[in-house]
Each structure stands twice: as C-alpha cells, then as structure tokens.
C-alpha cells in the first residue's frame, strides 16, 4: 500500500465475512481512518479481521456536512478508506460526492476490486450477460413511473436492487408493463446461509413470493426486450 495521501474505496463482503481480499485487509489495517456507512455494521467486520484503525461514520445523512472537512484532512496528508455496509462503496451507497470532490482537488483515489451483489446475481441468472444495465434501486414514488417506462424499452439485461417489503409491488408493476411472461431471476441473501436464486416469468415469481416469507436484500435480473 502506498503511504501517501489518497482515498481508498474498499469493497467489503456482501454476506460471508471471508469474502474480502488480502489487499483490502492490508489497506484497512494501514490507513489512518476508515469511513463507514454504519459503524455498528462495519465494526463486526473490523473486529472479525482484527483491524484496530479509527472508524468514522459517513452516510447519506451526513456526507454533505462532512465533505469539506474530510477533503481538508486528505489535503493535509491523511490516508482514508471508504467502505459501505456491504459490497463496493458508491454503488447505490454514499461515496460519489466524496470521490468527485477528491478528483476536483487532485487527491488520488484508488478503488480496489471486490464484492458487489449485482455481478453474482447476473451470472447466476442464466440471462445474457454480455450487455446489461444496472438501475440500482427504483424510486419509491416520484420518478418511479418514468424509470419503469425506460426499462420497458431496454433491449439489454436489466439489474435492479429491491427491498423485501417492496418486492411484490415491483414484480406486479414490471409484469404489467413488460408482460407477465418476461423472464426474470431474483437472488437474495447472496453468499449467506440461506442464499437463493429463483428463475421464471414475472407471473411465476409473483406467485412464488406471495406464498413465501422474504428476508434480506434482493437483486432482480430481467431479460431485455
């Protein structure tokens, strides 16, 4: 690891605590400060791998407020790592603003390769993976309809993140818009004990999830038009 000012973006496991690279562990042990989306969640990983560095919160509700002070600390020589609760930071998680500010101030940014939920879900879906588009989380209300309309016309495989309490609503809306026979794959609890991937049509998956209890974050992979 380079001992010069920079921001490291460090992917963390999406479930199994062993799914972290040796390089990521070295970086987390050697930086001055670790910025975490939720320090309570990240402390489990930190303790598991015997990392003793300072942990500070950096999340959607304080990133604007903390941005200037973090940039000043980086400019003064501090070395930081940004992690999310699970997976690669700044993908459907806080981090974009800090990365952009670092580039604007000529502060080096280095992103390590590592875990992210969308790629295992895509590969495991059996749907075309040579061309795909990642939409993240759909808006819960405002802008949801227009986003769904864009997905309707998409010829590439589409990947979405969704929470359990909104899944049935999302499947119903997508089925009505794209056709209930459109093929879809849903992965949940990736890398965990109860990992599950279900493939079928929107109609089949809606029926399945109406009769099965849901837990854990979900990845929806939809066949293109």
Predicted segments with their positions:
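Class I SAM-dependent methyltransferase SAM-binding "motif I" and its flanking Rossmann-like core
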Residues: 97-154
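Conserved helicase motor
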Residues: 57-64, 137-139
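Generic beta-sheet signal
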Residues: 6-10, 76-84, 132, 156-160, ...
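Glycine-rich, flexible N-terminal cofactor/catalytic loop recognition
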Residues: 1-60
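Short active-site oxyanion
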Residues: 28-34, 106-109, 157-158
């Amino acid at each position: 690891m380079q001992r010069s000012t920079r921001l490291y973006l460090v992917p963390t496991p999406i479930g199994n605590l062993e799914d972290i690279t040796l390089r990521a562990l070295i970086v987390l042990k050697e930086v001055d400060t670790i910025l975490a989306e939720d320090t309570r969640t990240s402390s489990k990983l930190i303790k598991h791998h015997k990392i003793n560095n300072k942990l500070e919160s950096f999340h959607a509700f304080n990133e604007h407020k903390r941005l200037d002070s973090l940039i000043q600390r980086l400019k003064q020589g501090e070395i930081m790592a940004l992690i999310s609760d699970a997976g690669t930071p700044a993908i459907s998680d806080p981090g974009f603003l800090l990365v952009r500010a670092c580039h604007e101030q000529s502060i080096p940014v280095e992103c390590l390769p590592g875990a992210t939920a969308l790629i295992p879900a895509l590969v495991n879906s059996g749907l075309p993976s040579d061309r795909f588009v990642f939409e993240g989380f759909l808006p819960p209300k405002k802008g949801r309809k227009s986003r769904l309309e864009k997905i309707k016309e998409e010829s590439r495989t589409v990947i979405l993140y969704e929470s359990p309490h909104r899944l049935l609503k999302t499947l119903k809306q997508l089925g009505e818009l794209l056709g209930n026979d459109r093929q879809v794959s849903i992965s949940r609890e990736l890398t965990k004990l109860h990992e599950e991937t279900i493939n079928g049509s929107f109609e089949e998956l809606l029926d399945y999830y109406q009769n099965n209890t849901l837990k854990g974050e979900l990845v929806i992979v939809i066949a293109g038009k």
